[in-house]
Amino acid sequence: LSAASWRTQSIYFLLTDRFGRTDNSTTATCNTGNEIYCGGSWQGIIDHLDYIEGMGFTAIWISPITEQLPQDTADGEAYHGYWQQKIYDVNSNFGTADNLKSLSDALHARGMYLMVDVVPDHMGYAGNGNDVDYSVFDPFDSSSYFHPYCLITDWDNLTMVEDCWEGDTIVSLPDLDTTETAVRTIWYDWVADLVSNYSVDGLRIDSVLEVQPDFFPGYNKASGVYCVGEIDNGNPASDCPYQKVLDGVLNYPIYWQLLYAFESSSGSISNLYNMIKSVASDCSDPTLLGNFIENHDNPRFAKYTSDYSQAKNVLSYIFLSDGIPIVYAGEEQHYAGGKVPYNREATWLSGYDTSAELYTWIATTNAIRKLAIAADSAYITYANDAFYTDSNTIAMAKGTSGSQVITVLSNKGSSGSSYTLTLSGSGYTSGTKLIEAYTCTSVTVDSSGDIPVPMASGLPRVLLPASVVDSSSLCGGSGRLYVE
């Protein structure tokens, strides 16, 4: 699937080992602290696609599929998929190649898409970097394919980050020399075959900062699909240039400021506002970035705040701003795991509860986004405009003038009072009838061109023209504009 076609998708990210088991158990033990395989499988994903599709997601991103180091080390097992050894074999803990093809087929039968996590940067070895037996790697079976051993100690030194190794002295991550023609040829051929063999629609690329940038244009091109890269860094000046070599990157610059703005009622809205402007100016196309507030590498949002209103605000942001929304499995169940490995809880232990408060919130928010896309062909590429802030509130407009979606977010939390926010600068003219899509409340733009937005309990508000909502399946409308 092309980068342009990915703009309108929404992605549910899961670690295959932690989402669903082949036996469909919802009680099988998964102690995250043990850092071992918990029994998730590709068949387990297939069996619970209704749960994912029920939130309106159109795609899933699954953890890496390659054969991993087999040992149970002091750092645990390779259940996450980032310690690969044999790139032409699939991880048998998750099933067979046919099971993976069946997952791809099951998604496509629903009109959904498959994104696979890939790791061109490194392999994985159970042992010290000085003692690696390179013959265990297929096809990179000699040290000539790799950078000489040195651990990354200074993450601000880009040369070191690219040339030295991630990992530690228990599990070393031998760093492939991606400047070598032999390495490039193998990876470019491999990624083309991966996409072809499993009908893959998109790729998430791990550890992008650790690879020389000029490796990626050939890799992205060979894949023939949308590629979004991971750069775990909050600086748009260093992240955005990677859009010259990849379709998109994960939106870490927004992630950090979104977290800081909404983790408490004293969070900085102004820093988020400034970062929205920075990303818009520094990145060549913010609509191709991957938006998230949770993943498997950072503590969950609920670890910072247990407040449901604050959680709803950050979710509304990732869906209704520029970029492709990504939700990490368990986020919809308000999981609260801290840093790695505690943020890698088994989804099945929630019983796949479709009545959970954030499950239904995500479903509604996804429907609002799909309605905006259906109603306005320019919506998805229209630059999001953060046009109002106060100490607790940010308001944004996205879409063609006259049908723009107005999103109002608050960090006040569930104890926030009820009040009317007089919102100016939305671009709507006096007398325009709007509907707030979460509460189905009618609002009319006043004679000054201001919108009287009814705020309560620190909850987000999203306003669309009444004519658009009335033609949708939201708020008891006619359903003429198809929204799942």
Curated annotation (Swiss-Prot):
InterPro entries: A-amylase-like (IPR013777), A_amylase_C_dom (IPR015340), Glyco_hydro_13_cat_dom (IPR006047), Glyco_hydro_b (IPR013780), Glycoside_hydrolase_SF (IPR017853). Ca(2+) 1 binds at residues 121, 162, 175, 210. Its main location: secreted. Ca(2+) 2 binds at residues 206, 230. Keywords: Calcium, Carbohydrate metabolism, Disulfide bond, Glycoprotein, Glycosidase, Hydrolase, Metal-binding, Secreted. Disulfide bonds join 30-38, 150-164, 240-283, 440-475. Monomer. This is Acid alpha-amylase. It comes from Aspergillus niger.
